[in-house]
C-alpha cells in the first residue's frame, strides 16, 4: 500500500457526513434484510466491501419477479447509489444532495417495476437534506478499503471458522467474527448467536464512548485474565462500558508500517485470547 493509505479521519470534522452515509447505507442493509434468507449472526443484514464502496451482494428476487436477483451498491468513488439486476437493467442516483427518503422512493419504484415489493418503514429515511462532503467521503473510502484489505489478510491466517468481513450500518463499522470451535458452557447448543466461543474484531469511525476512529477486539465469553494480558504495540484495554482491546486509528498515521501495526494488533489479541479461552 502507499504511504498515505490511511488518511486522517478526525470524526468532528466529518461527523455530519458520516451520519448521512449511515442513513444511505441503512437503505441497502434493510433491503437486503427484507429479501435475503435468514442466516446466523445476522449475516443477511450485513453489507460487504467491493472495489468501489459498499454492496449488498446478490439479493434473490421473489419468484413472481421479472428478474432472478439484483444488487445494490453505494459507490463511494462516484458518489452514487447503484441498483443492478440480472437482466441487465439498472438505476443510478447521485448521493450528493440527495434526500434519504428520495433514495428510498426511487429504489422502491425501480424494484416494484420488476415485481419486487419492498415493505420498509419510510420513517427510517428522512425527508430532510443532509450534509455530504465529497472529499471527506473519499478519505473515508480510502481508509475503509485499505482496512478491509488488512482484515482480509488477518482472516486468511485464522484457523477454524470465521465469518465474512462485514459492514454493519447501525454502528457504521467493519467487523469480523472468529470462532474457537468450542461451545460456551451452560448455553443451549441450538442458540445460534450465543452457543459458540467467539471473538469480534472491528473498525469504527468513532462513537459516544470513543469519539475518534478506532479498531477493537472483543471476546465472548471474556476470559478473566485477558484484561491484564500484555497488549500488542499501541493498544490499550477498554474497560467501560464494554471491555475489549482498542487501537486508535491515529496510531497508524505516524507509524512507518501502518499495515503491520494493524495486523499485529489483530493477531496479537486473537492469540492472547485464544490461549486463555481453553
Task: Name the predicted role of every residue range.
Residues 2, 79-92, 119-135, 213, ...:
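Glycine-rich, often proline-containing surface loops adjacent to acidic residues and nearby aromatics
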Residues 2-69:
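N-terminal ordered "arm"
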Residues 47-122:
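Long, hydrophobic/aromatic-enriched structural stretches that serve as scaffold segments
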Residues 63-73, 102, 205, 209, ...:
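Ser/Thr/Asn(+Pro)-rich, low-complexity disordered segments
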Residues 97-157:
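Internal, hydrophobic cores of structured domains that mediate oligomerization or house catalytic pockets
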Residues 131-207, 214:
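Aromatic/basic-lined ligand-recognition segments
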Residues 198-245:
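Low-complexity, glycine/alanine/valine/leucine- and proline-rich hydrophobic stretches
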Residues 240-278:
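TerminUS-proximal long segments
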Amino acid at each position: 500500500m502507499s504511504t498515505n493509505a490511511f488518511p486522517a479521519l478526525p470524526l468532528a470534522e466529518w461527523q455530519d457526513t458520516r451520519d448521512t452515509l449511515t442513513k444511505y447505507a441503512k437503505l441497502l442493509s434493510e433491503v437486503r434484510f427484507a429479501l435475503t434468507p435468514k442466516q446466523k449472526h445476522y449475516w443477511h443484514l450485513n453489507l460487504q466491501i467491493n472495489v468501489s464502496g459498499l454492496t449488498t451482494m446478490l439479493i434473490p428476487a421473489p419468484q413472481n419477479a421479472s428478474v432472478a436477483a439484483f444488487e445494490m451498491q453505494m459507490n463511494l468513488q462516484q458518489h452514487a447509489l447503484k441498483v443492478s439486476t440480472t437482466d441487465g437493467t439498472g438505476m443510478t442516483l447521485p448521493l450528493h444532495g440527495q434526500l434519504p427518503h428520495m433514495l428510498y422512493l426511487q429504489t422502491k419504484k425501480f424494484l416494484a417495476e420488476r415485481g419486487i415489493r419492498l415493505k420498509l418503514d419510510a420513517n427510517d429515511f428522512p425527508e430532510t437534506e443532509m450534509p455530504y462532503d465529497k472529499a471527506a467521503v473519499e478519505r473515508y473510502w480510502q481508509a475503509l478499503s485499505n482496512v478491509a484489505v488488512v482484515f482480509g489478510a488477518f482472516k486468511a491466517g485464522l484457523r477454524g471458522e470465521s465469518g465474512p468481513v462485514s459492514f454493519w450500518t447501525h454502528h457504521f463499522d467493519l467487523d469480523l467474527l472468529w470462532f474457537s470451535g468450542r461451545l460456551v458452557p451452560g448455553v443451549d447448543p441450538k442458540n445460534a448467536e450465543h452457543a459458540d466461543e467467539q471473538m469480534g474484531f472491528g473498525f469504527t469511525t468513532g462513537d459516544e464512548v470513543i469519539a475518534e476512529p478506532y479498531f477493537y477486539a472483543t471476546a465472548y465469553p471474556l476470559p478473566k485474565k485477558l484484561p491484564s494480558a500484555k497488549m500488542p504495540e499501541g493498544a490499550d484495554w477498554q474497560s467501560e462500558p464494554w471491555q475489549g482491546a482498542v487501537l486508535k486509528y491515529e496510531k497508524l498515521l505516524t507509524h512507518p508500517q501502518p499495515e503491520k501495526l494493524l495486523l499485529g494488533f489483530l493477531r496479537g489479541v486473537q492469540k492472547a485470547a485464544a490461549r486463555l479461552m481453553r
